[in-house]
């Protein structure tokens, strides 16, 4: 069997709270090949593996995916899901794909930068994207910076490689 726990700030979180999934069991891997630092970051000495997924557990023990921990943008004291921003803005018919990342702000936290790839033959601009964001997102979740790009980097599995967008 596999054990699962939802952790936040060093403790198991209560139902309804968002926390990180950790798993432990005989089929959980023992570490990354030739990457001891990464293994130490994600595999606790007692065998609990930190998956990097943030979820909320309800009273019936069902888990609801929130986002990947690496996709959290810290802005004005709030944890904001980059995936939520990407989904909301990416629904614009003239946007082929987009990706939000956190960039350093003068306040020591992060501002939201959104990289946007336009669909071929469209005339979308950062101003249009800003106006759309006002319709779709609360003020705290709206990108401060919008840059139009020809393409976004992807991983081998064709997911957007946000880590390659970081300045």
Spell out what each predicted region is.
Residues 13-16, 30-34:
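Active-site glycine/GP-rich loop and adjacent strand/helix microenvironment
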Residues 4, 20, 25, 30-31, ...:
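AMP-binding/adenylate-forming catalytic core of the ANL superfamily
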Residues 1:
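Short gly/Ser/Thr-rich phosphate-binding loop of adenylate-forming enzymes
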Residues 47:
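A structured beta-alpha segment of the ubiquitous adenosine-cofactor-binding alpha/beta core
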């Amino acid at each position: 069997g596999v054990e699962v726990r939802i952790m936040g700030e060093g403790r198991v979180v209560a139902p309804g709270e968002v926390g990180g999934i950790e798993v432990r069991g005989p089929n959980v891997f023992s570490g990354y090949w030739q990457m001891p630092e990464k293994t130490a970051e994600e595999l606790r000495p007692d065998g609990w593996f930190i998956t990097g997924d943030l979820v909320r557990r309800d009273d019936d023990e069902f888990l609801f995916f929130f986002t990947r921990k690496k996709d959290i943008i810290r802005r004005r004291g709030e944890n904001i899901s980059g995936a939520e921003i990407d989904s909301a803005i990416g629904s614009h018919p003239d946007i082929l794909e987009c990706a939000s990342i956190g960039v350093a702000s003068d306040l020591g936290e992060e501002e939201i930068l959104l990289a946007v790839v336009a669909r071929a033959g469209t005339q979308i601009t950062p101003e249009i994207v800003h106006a759309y964001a006002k319709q779709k997102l609360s003020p705290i979740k709206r990108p401060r910076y919008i840059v139009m790009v020809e393409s976004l980097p992807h991983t081998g599995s064709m997911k957007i490689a946000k880590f390659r967008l970081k300045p």
